[in-house]
């Protein structure tokens, strides 16, 4: 794997639009890791047509980092199961690892994910609730030197923070950025991302995925016209006829590709 993820085609597939479920952590009745159930979940995602799998995010984001080596063990287990099952099924899956914490921790997690063959990191900024835009951008820039980054706009109700238009414009201008998962559950915050990406000049290069569970259909179908620009597409056609196992899929792709009026 190269640091930009182009060698295995993962970057291009991510840009085309995929269904990418967040892997839940399977536990036994004794609250211990259940490898049999975990394997079944991962195989189901592949068989259902998922184009990517995100590991160490969502319901597994925090707890697996509290036990020594458990984060690495979960990432390794998921990688091995997906590699084996996709080979049997003659398909490919983009592997995304969650990356969180302050810069030192995030660097360590990014390096681990890259060493295990993950294609990109979904970067949480929850560890910086009071940081300035300059500080946030520098943090992201540091992580992009380790692994391709997908931004994550998490709703404030579950630990996210408000991220302004200026941050998203500068975020989109950084190198080695693949896209953004937009899940603030807020239309105005979502529009800040749209405007920031459009004004970055890189709208045609980045893929934007919706995690707005309260507005999935609207995100997939709405077209936007940022001020001073031609119409922007907020949606992508479905890439699979199989059951959708996760609602976080590409939207907002190739925003404002044309020049101002």
Tell me what each language-model feature is.
Residues 142-145, 155-261:
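Catalytic alpha/beta core domains of metabolic enzymes, predominantly
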Residues 2-162:
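Active-site beta->alpha loop and helix N-cap motifs at the rims of alpha/beta catalytic domains
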């Amino acid at each position: 794997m190269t640091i930009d993820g182009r060698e295995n085609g993962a970057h291009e597939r991510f840009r085309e639009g995929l269904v990418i479920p967040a892997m839940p952590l399977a536990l036994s009745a004794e609250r211990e890791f259940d490898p049999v159930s975990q394997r079944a979940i991962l195989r189901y995602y592949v068989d259902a047509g998922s184009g990517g799998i995100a590991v160490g995010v969502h319901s597994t984001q925090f707890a697996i980092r509290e036990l020594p080596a458990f984060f690495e063990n979960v990432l390794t287990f998921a990688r091995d199961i997906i590699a084996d099952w996709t080979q049997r099924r003659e398909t490919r899956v983009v592997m995304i690892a969650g990356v969180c914490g302050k810069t030192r921790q995030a660097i360590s997690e990014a390096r681990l994910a890259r060493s295990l063959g993950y294609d990109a990191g979904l970067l949480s900024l929850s560890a910086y609730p009071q940081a300035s835009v300059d500080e946030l951008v520098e943090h992201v820039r540091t992580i992009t030197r380790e692994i391709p980054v997908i931004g994550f706009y998490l709703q404030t109700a579950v630990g996210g923070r408000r991220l302004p238009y200026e941050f998203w414009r500068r975020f989109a201008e950084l190198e080695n950025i693949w896209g953004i998962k937009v899940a603030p559950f807020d239309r105005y915050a979502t529009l800040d991302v749209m405007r920031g990406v459009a004004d970055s000049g890189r709208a045609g290069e980045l893929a934007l995925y919706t995690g707005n569970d309260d507005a999935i259909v609207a995100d997939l179908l709405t077209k936007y016209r940022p001020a001073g620009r031609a119409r922007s597409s907020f949606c992508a056609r479905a890439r699979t006829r199989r059951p959708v196992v996760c609602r976080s899929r590409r939207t907002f792709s190739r925003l404002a590709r044309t020049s101002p009026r």
